[in-house]
Amino acid sequence: MLSTSSSRPFKSKFRAAFWPIYNYELGKFIPMSALMFCILFNQNILRILKDSILISEISAEIAGFAKVYCVTPAAALFVIIYAKMINHLTFEKIFYYLTAFFIGFFVLFAFVIYPNIHIFHVHPDYLADWMERYPHFKWYISLIGNWGYIVYYSLAELWPNIFYVLLFWQFANELTTTEEAKRFYTLFSLFGNSSLILVGFLMMNLSSKETIVKHFINISDSKITLVQISTILVTIVAVICCLLIRFISRNVFTNPLFYAKAKSGRSTSERMGIIKSFKYIVKSKYLWLLLICSAAFGFAINLVEAVWKAKIKELYPTVNTYAEFNSLYILWTGVAIMVMTIIGNNVMRMHNWFVAAVISPVIIMVTGVLFFVLIVFDQKILSLFDGAILMSPLALAVSIGGIQNILAKGTKYSIWDTSREMLYIPLDQELKTKGKAAVDVISAKVGKSSSGLVQSIIFTIIPTATFTSISPVLMVVFTFVCLAWIYAVRKIYFEYQKIA
């Protein structure tokens, strides 16, 4: 009897640490985990494709311009449209309409625009002539001349913030209580982000010369085939997402066991108009701090990624080789996220919210500064370790940048994302929906576009500048932004304690 009773606390602690889900909760937990898996599956295929196409077909420098002048205006427009949609449509219909729009364009690009890019784009010689005539405006000319790549990149950039950050987490926050969130959210992250490993293996094969696809079809252009097969996969998984949304809406939201409001129905209180809604949001100090945190991540990581991706293109210049390397990076990012999720789950249980939330900015700042130091002082560092480093300076820069990004994304997509979502749960319905839409969609793009704006101003003023030459300036800006992020996390923790 003694051994049996003493084993119960051990089993209880083990379950609390690794599987804090009760059997009756599986009807809610499993479909939500599957939905997150599918959304992230598509997100990471699109991430590999958008960078491989844009950077290989044009350049790494153009990405900053695209984020400032295309992605951010599109994100702002979406928030306005979404605020209108949420007043007139159910969440289920909004999800279907947005999915149809995005998938429709991706299919159009893969099967019509990309294979016939010479028809839709300005001739490269004509474009090069105009860029040579007006060097200070060459990147703006390139944006217009390569519009197909830019629109694809912009929509692929918006996918994570619309479908994952906004729609999935809004769905989860509505369905999940604060107590459940502490147990569910890290496991959502664990199962959902395992899709990165699958995507990594899958895309490595599709982008390689020895792809399994060549045993079934004749490949005339490997990059076109890569994009088309990937788009078919994205379309199939998007349909599965819609079916999961339908299942959860019909079976989980209507079950009082899973959703407390099912007995009385969802809130039917009158919603605010757009202008009144945004005035309400602007007055919220809480949302402003959330916006700073989200924008700081986008700003900081984009500074590091911009330099790193320029180095990747030097080492892997074609669409397929770039995609193959990107797939390997995504795979290891998935592994890092799963490890960090397990760590984060226990950190969140054993410590307060601030300890868990501050891990991401600290790791990103430390690893980012190390990467910039390597880029800025590469020759001096290599001379210090003469003969000890068995790779070229370029390969070393790509490898260190990859490690930095894997650790940064690993902590962000596991510990920080789950910590951030807990901040929305105590808020009222208006801030949970429209407030979340404004923060999640706009803030990340404001961060990336602000970073892109810094880069675009430099490249416009100095047409001969490269990412390597401006790295010292970017390193200083990067450090300042990370410190601001840490400060905002501390301030919002005090606000969270007041309402939680």
Swiss-Prot record:
Paired cysteines (S-S): none
Chief localization: membrane
Domain of life: Bacteria
GO molecular function: ATP binding; ATP:ADP antiporter activity
Transmembrane segments: 21-41, 62-82, 94-114, 149-169, 184-204, 224-244, 287-307, 328-348, 357-377, 381-401, 469-489
Keyword Ribosomal protein belongs to the record: no
Keywords on record: ATP-binding, Cell membrane, Membrane, Nucleotide-binding, Transmembrane, Transmembrane helix, Transport
Topological relation to the membrane, as annotated: Multi-pass membrane protein
Compartments where located: Cell membrane
One Gene Ontology CC term in the entry: plasma membrane
Signal peptide: none
Function noted in UniProt: Provides the rickettsial cell with host ATP in exchange for rickettsial ADP. This is an obligate exchange system. This energy acquiring activity is an important component of rickettsial parasitism.
Family under the similarity heading: Belongs to the ADP/ATP translocase tlc family.
Protein name per UniProt: ADP,ATP carrier protein 5
Gene source species: Rickettsia bellii (strain RML369-C)
